[in-house]
């Protein structure tokens, strides 16, 4: 029996693909070597310890229907579209070695006619007349008895959109999480016009087989049929949940400020695991009572626009004369908090 396993996803859903990856990783035999090939439609993928409110323009993402997905590995935030090819190599220890998987990807690129090299802790770069340009970034995860290396290759990604979603609004957001390092990047189509996802997958597969001296049939993973993977439904539910993607953010503080016709408002939030642990309000309004009451209601509230709006609008019962101000506050919060 072969020790290799090759899986290819035909889903573009990041939550589906990351759930598949997680399930395979948890249940694979320690003697198995796995290659999983996949890609995502418009998604910002953040590292396990990152703060989406810090890393991403979450309001722009919502408007443009871009998903947020938190992976189980560390590292920084990246934007995925169908111009990216994603790969995951898994193996039990002591077989797991990220230098092996890196060399497989480099060999695949070389077979396609691209001379690339490893740079720093997790990048692959090509040399251009303008200097080194990143074509691949990776992240890693290890447990006691196994590990995985996953990453992306930029084929024909819309690089103009990177700045749309990976540059957060210029808000006063002080975070204790990891801030992603931006790198100068380029697409493989600049070097190989017309290169396709299928060609890259085939090259990586051939390099994978060549390294281990074995071949196996590919298993196609599709959302049209629930994957036969232990605990997949539960893993997918967690991967797609707000609690995982947003609520796992490290502790941070957020300051929102706005000036209305009736006065200026500053809202200070301390947030842990997606819940407000402290809220303060500062205002020069002639009637600060409803704002003070609003801040008092927020202890333990989910840091989500709809939940804050709900608490704000609940004050209409106690402060009917301040309906205009409270509705303006609620509308502002809807746009300021995502």
Curated annotation (Swiss-Prot):
Alphabetical list of CDD domains matching this protein: BPL_LplA_LipB
Gene Ontology molecular function: ATP binding; lipoate-protein ligase activity; lipoyltransferase activity
SUPFAM superfamilies noted in UniProt: Class II aaRS and biotin synthetases, SufE/NifU
GO cellular component annotations of the record: cytosol
Catalytic activity: L-lysyl-[lipoyl-carrier protein] + (R)-lipoate + ATP = N(6)-[(R)-lipoyl]-L-lysyl-[lipoyl-carrier protein] + AMP + diphosphate + H(+)
UniProt keyword annotation of Cytoplasm present: yes
Binding site for ATP: 71, 76-79, 134
Subunit structure: Monomer.
UniProt record similarity statement: Belongs to the LplA family.
Name of the featured protein: Lipoate-protein ligase A
